[in-house]
């Protein structure tokens, strides 16, 4: 009888000891899920851009964003992901996580309306990234650089990159420049510091 009571006692102690571990595991899974964003529609992409530019992704180096379909942005006014710099070249908000394009294409992206509004601004699908990884993304579209401002960085994938990696991405942009000075206006990235392209 004593052995039976002792056995039950130890079984209860073991069960109680496992409860915090189960709760911790659930919290960990919840945290991992909450930092992942899946994009399947144009509206979801536009919302993601707005969230980054509003500061919702500030400091989220563990953020994972996955593009799950090709998206056509015909008729949409595009604001680069990663806020425009002010005239002192300060960037209020930017993306620092992982963006997986998964081989998908963003098409008919028109950067023309955004270009030239602020001097020293960085333009692209992403405006500015830091400690980020962008992969498997194709951007198709156009830009007509007619603004009066100069010295802007333009890249189809990202305008300016710092301490980041851009991997397996494709730029397919038609470009018209009306007497403005731009860095990197032909390729993936306008300006890069401590960044890797693969």
Describe the role of every protein-language-model region.
Residues 1-12:
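Positively charged n-region of N-terminal signal peptides that target proteins for export
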Residues 2-3, 17, 41, 119:
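Short linear sequence motifs
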Residues 5-6, 20, 47:
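Intrinsically disordered, low-complexity segments enriched in glycine/proline and serine/threonine
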Residues 15-24:
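C-terminal segment of classical bacterial N-terminal signal peptides
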Residues 24-198:
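Surface-exposed repetitive/solenoidal architectures
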């Amino acid at each position: 009888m004593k052995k039976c009571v002792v056995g039950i006692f130890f079984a209860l102690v073991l069960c109680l000891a496992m409860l915090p571990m189960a709760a911790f595991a659930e919290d960990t899974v919840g945290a991992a899920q909450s930092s992942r964003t899946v994009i399947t529609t144009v509206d979801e992409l536009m919302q993601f851009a707005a969230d980054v530019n509003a500061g919702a992704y500030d400091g989220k180096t563990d953020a994972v964003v996955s593009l799950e379909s090709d998206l056509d942005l015909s008729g949409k006014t595009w604001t680069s992901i990663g806020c425009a710099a002010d005239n002192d070249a300060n960037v209020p908000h930017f993306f620092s996580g992982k963006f997986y394009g998964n081989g998908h294409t963003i098409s008919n992206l028109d950067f023309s309306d955004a270009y030239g509004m602020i001097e020293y601004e960085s333009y692209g699908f992403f405006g500015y990234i830091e400690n980020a990884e962008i992969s498997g993304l194709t951007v198709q579209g156009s830009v007509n650089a007619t603004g009066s401002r100069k010295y802007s960085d333009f890249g189809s994938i990202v305008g300016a990159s710092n301490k980041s990696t851009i991997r397996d991405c494709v730029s397919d942009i038609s470009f018209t420049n009306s007497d403005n000075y731009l860095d990197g206006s032909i390729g993936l990235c306008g300006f890069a510091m401590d960044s890797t392209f693969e």
